[in-house]
Amino acid sequence: MVMHSEDEPYKCKFCGKAFDNLHLYLTHERTHTGEKPYECNKCGKAFSCSSSIRKHARIHTGEKPYICKQCGKAFRYSSSIRNHENTHTGEKPCECKQCGKAFSYSSYFRIHERIHTGEQVYKCKECGKTFTYPSAFHKHKSTHTSQKLYECKECGKAFDCFSSFHSHEGVHTGEKPYECRTWKSLQ
């Protein structure tokens, strides 16, 4: 049992970081233990906090509650719409100190940084192979299983890779998820 007092907040036994909130403390400790008690009943992916599994569920339900006021595009996550809004303003707030390249999306910037560090943050539990990019890692994982995690609600076609599933959705909606700005400017 974790004890605390007014003077002594919840303190991580692994790194000493202190928390005033029990929920934040328990979630933090899971970063050290690797415990992931929240499992998706659709695909089996596990998470260390309940809010993460609620956000993840949107992949399976197709829910996109965040709508861009400028163009009407819908997003699953609040962070995605914040990053998207930079495409309207042209703002690129994330700049690499190593090479000066700037990014609209913080996630693209974090991935770009790995070019300089060589960091490989994704490791396959099945074979131990490591990957720099999440897309390569997720594609690799499907080589170990025949399970398809993403199923189209319109036609039932299933995909093991989210990007392939997302591209397929355009067959039914007419949406083209990737737009070539060079081609668009030539028209």
From Swiss-Prot:
Keywords: Metal-binding, Repeat, Zinc, Zinc-finger. One of its GO terms (biological process) is regulation of gene expression. A zinc finger (C2H2-type) spans 10-32, 38-60, 66-88, 94-116, 122-144, 150-172. The keyword Nucleotide-binding does not apply. This is Putative zinc finger protein 833. It comes from the Eukaryota. One of its GO terms (cellular component) is nucleus. The keyword Oxidoreductase does not apply. It comes from Homo sapiens. GO terms for molecular function: DNA-binding transcription factor activity; zinc ion binding.
